Design a protein with these regions (language model features):
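Active-site-adjacent structural elements that line small-molecule/cofactor binding pockets in enzymes
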Residues: 1-317
Length: 317
């Protein structure tokens, strides 16, 4: 049985750099398999005008400030940057980190930041997912040492583009976030090494079946794709205590509790409850949990996941 893998996703909003980096360093020391942050330039929870750090420069800092965990954006906003530049950036981070980079990419969804920066948001989500597919195909080829020229009529206009240096890793992994059944999961099937999704085990079991069908149609072995589920987790000895901690975290992030009342991606409770929850996801093939951690990054939750929850899940499996 594969062991449970844990990733720490450090919210990039409502933090200073020192607090962000020290929490990443702690996650690395504790033995998290991967450390991630968002790719946003305005805050996405609560007040959008809160402080927030930029994605790729933050990854460069993580590359130098950690030693063993993989690092990536969950997930990169494809609209923000030319995909060739993204490939160049992630290769640089791969060298800075000694071969620990993951290329995270998604279609982008947060309108406020696109409006503020004047970034093209496309005609709608469908078009952004078409751009994502085209970008991911190009990035995979570039990372594999191929020369890329764009077809006419697409979003991008690459001409005899190639990367030097290539990544440290022989196969630098691509992580795609999202679970749209027609487009996103087709892109996952074609190019992704990792896939991140949110939802109940029942919902993700269904999405997984859709992904398998796409894999079959593009001729890819679905077992090559690591399934990861995201959750925002707070662990304490009682659910009431965990809830109080969550309330403090949300207050720090200037986010009213009413905003998240119906959000089933917040998992708040005891270590035993998390073990049960993780086991339910393992039943449907999700062996990696990417734990979103709001600033100022609760150390007790970070520790309990590694010291209590992971051994409990592995023992039960």
């Amino acid at each position: 049985v594969t062991q449970l893998k844990l990733g720490a996703v450090l919210w990039s909003q409502a933090t200073d750099w020192a607090g962000f980096l020290s929490s990443a360093h702690r996650a690395d020391e504790l033995g998290y398999d991967s450390i991630w942050t968002w790719d946003h330039v305005y805050a996405i929870f609560g007040d959008p005008d809160q402080p927030i750090v930029e994605g790729y420069t933050a990854l460069a800092g993580l590359a130098m400030g950690t030693e063993r965990a993989d690092i990536g954006l969950l997930v990169g906003a494809n609209t923000f940057r030319n995909p060739g530049i993204v490939a160049k950036s992630v290769v640089t981070v791969d060298h800075m980190s000694g071969g620990r980079a993951i290329l995270g990419l998604g279609g982008a969804w947060f309108g406020i930041e696109h409006d503020a920066f004047g970034i093209d948001f496309g005609s709608g989500f469908g078009q952004r997912l078409d751009w994502l597919d085209e970008a991911t195909a190009a990035i995979r080829a570039l990372l594999d040492g191929e020369t890329v020229s764009s077809d006419d009529g697409g979003r991008y206009d690459f001409r005899d583009l190639k990367l030097n240096p290539l990544p440290v890793q022989a196969h630098l992994p691509i992580m795609i976030g999202g679970s749209g059944e027609k487009k996103t999961l087709r892109t996952v099937a074609a190019y992704a090494d990792q896939w991140n999704a949110f939802g109940s085990p029942e919902v993700l079991s269904h999405k997984d079946q859709v992904l398998r069908a796409h894999c079959e149609s593009v001729g890819r072995d679905h077992t090559r794709i690591e399934r990861t589920v995201g959750g925002k987790i707070v662990i304490r000895d009682t659910e009431a205590e965990a809830r109080r901690v969550l309330e403090d975290l949300m207050e720090h992030n200037r986010t009213p509790m009413a905003n998240i009342e119906d959000d089933d991606t917040f998992w708040v409770g005891t270590a035993d409850e998390m073990i049960e929850r993780f086991l339910a996801y393992r039943e449907v093939g999700f062996d990696t949990v990417l734990v979103e951690m709001p600033a100022p990054y609760d150390p007790e939750t970070m520790e309990k996941l590694v010291e209590v929850v992971r051994p409990g899940v592995d023992a039960a499996a």
